[in-house]
Amino acid sequence: MLVNATEMLKKAKAGHYAVGQFNINNLEWTKAILQTAQELNSPVILGVSEGAGKYMTGYKTVVGMVNGMMEELNITVPVALHLDHGSYDGCLKCVEAGFSSIMFDGSHYPIDENVAKTKELVKIVAEHNMSLEAEVGSIGGEEDGVVGMGECADPDECKRVADVGINFLSAGIGNIHGKYPANWQGL
């Protein structure tokens, strides 16, 4: 059974350990990640980008695949299924499909709109016992066809988003996805 990532991460913080979040793109990756998490007796977060969700024929398919694999492989460690860098509509689809955690990437919206959309999602996830991550300031590099410049988030904007009741905040700190180029001016 999928679990909400919030409790998993609270336990990790209290126990002074990390929880890996690995993006899945197919059955083979998912199986390898689940088996390794079980072997290491480690909770795990399975991330799914919108592109990967489409590739795997939809979010309901992803939920069915993960739940089926957890049952067939006798996975007993906590597993959260998390939408990674989701649009507002993608978040709603993942709620409906049965994900246990979503990330709303509203970093490309003006801050007032990001806050308003995030606030709406806070109410929705509370009704479904899900966790919600929100982003302020873009993460640089390229992931799933999305290219960011790696800006630093405004601390006041971070506080505004955090104050609406999210579980986790993803704040751009000049970092990027992928390999750092030799001339990178961030961190």
Features from the language model and the residues they span:
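Alpha/beta enzyme core
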Residues: V3-G15, N26-A52, T57-T76, H85-L187
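Boundary/entry segment of secreted carbohydrate-active catalytic domains
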Residues: Y17-G20
